[in-house]
Regions:
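The conserved SAM/SAH-binding core of class I Rossmann-like methyltransferase domains
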Residues: 30-31, 103
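Helix-to-beta-strand junctions that scaffold the AdoMet/dcAdoMet cofactor pocket
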Residues: 22, 94-96
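S-adenosyl-L-methionine
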Residues: 30, 37-70
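Conserved small/polar residues in nucleotide/adenosyl-binding loops
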Residues: 1-5
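Conserved SAM-binding loop of SAM-dependent methyltransferases across substrates and taxa
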Residues: 11-24
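Conserved beta-strand signature within the Rossmann-like core of class I S-adenosyl-L-methionine
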Residues: 97-107
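A short SAM/SAH-binding and catalytic strip from SAM-dependent methyltransferases
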Residues: 72-87, 91-92, 106
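Active-site capping/gating segments
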Residues: 106-158
Length: 158
């Protein structure tokens, strides 16, 4: 299985914990800040995890490249942008039949409503919303799961 932690991997979540738990996956981490990529390379070396591709760049650039476009089983993202924009950055990486999984906050239902046109254009269907309750926190976290059902038009991401 090939997973891309596509947009703003930051400190490596959820990519690095997934790779630690699931040793058989291939993982690609993409971030626009080289210092984050350098940090993640050092962390993975110290922890002893391999089979990770680190990319310094932007999703909107790499999502257009044939070697990355529609090649991944799963793309993940944290809540770094509104859902329609996040989908535009991530969905082009996912192969048909694969999944886009993202973390969203308390406005997840509203963002889903605002994303219906983007879902249709980008070729994904909404599958599930998983509510996450964290101990000692009153914050509302949601994991949204989408399945890619058709190829994304070449003009995306813009």
């Amino acid at each position: 299985m090939c997973i891309r932690d596509s947009v703003g991997t930051g400190a490596g979540f959820p990519g690095l914990p997934l790779r630690i738990c699931l040793r058989n996956i291939e993982l690609t981490l993409l971030d626009s800040l080289n210092k984050r990529i350098n940090f993640l390379q050092e962390v993975s070396k110290q922890v002893g995890i391999d089979n990770i591709e680190f990319i310094h760049g932007r999703a909107e650039d790499f999502g257009k490249l044939e070697e990355y476009r529609e090649k991944y089983d799963i793309a993940t993202a944290r809540a770094v942008a509104g859902l329609p924009i996040l989908m535009e950055f991530c969905v082009p990486f996912v192969k048909v039949g694969g999944y886009f999984v993202c973390l969203k906050g308390p406005n997840a239902n509203l963002e889903l409503e605002e994303s219906k046109a983007a879902m249709d254009v980008l070729g994904v269907e909404f599958i599930e919303k998983i509510n996450i309750e964290l101990p000692e926190s009153d914050l509302n976290h949601n994991i949204l799961v989408f399945k890619k059902v058709k190829n994304t038009p070449d003009k995306y991401p813009r």
